[in-house]
UniProtKB/Swiss-Prot annotation:
Catalyzes the pyruvoyl-dependent decarboxylation of aspartate to produce beta-alanine. It comes from Frankia casuarinae (strain DSM 45818 / CECT 9043 / HFP020203 / CcI3). The lineage of its organism: Bacteria, Bacillati, Actinomycetota, Actinomycetes, Frankiales. It holds the Pfam family Asp_decarbox. This is Aspartate 1-decarboxylase 1. CDD domains: Asp_decarbox. Belongs to the PanD family. The keyword Phosphoprotein does not apply. Binds 1 pyruvoyl group covalently per subunit. Keywords: Autocatalytic cleavage, Cytoplasm, Decarboxylase, Lyase, Pantothenate biosynthesis, Pyruvate, Schiff base, Zymogen. Substrate binds at residues 58, 74-76. GO terms for cellular component: cytosol. HAMAP family: PanD (MF_00446).
Amino acid sequence: MIYREMLKSKIHRAVVRQADLHYVGSITIDATLMAAAGLWPGEKVDVLDITNGARLSTYVIEGEADSGTIGINGAAAHLISPGDLVIIVGYALMAEEDARSYQPNVVFVNGDNQLVRMGTDPAEAYDGVGLVRGDTNSPQPSLSEQAGDPRRAQ
């Protein structure tokens, strides 16, 4: 059987609120965002820094719900600083037949790291942030065109 490592969870364009070099390691994520993304404490994630291009792997620590906390801990604080925009990505190994139909949890946040929208399309660019879709230079489909997915109605 073939297994593929697929995108499972994505928190898009979160703002790093704190960085603590002297912590033992990890990323602290607001519990509400963790639940929306389907991330668990201790789960491995990649953190992609939009501000400076750094990429790293670490594990998740649950932060206070609805706090907007995104905190970089330990050695990663050398690479990612408060104020940086990041994408937090979780993956899952899936059998090929499951991977073909799996839809990830894509979480969009505002500048305060509060959940503003959820989706399943990893190429989606949320309206109002000045981005284009990841798979085309075409404009985003309207919200009414996207209404078929109940997770988009946030």
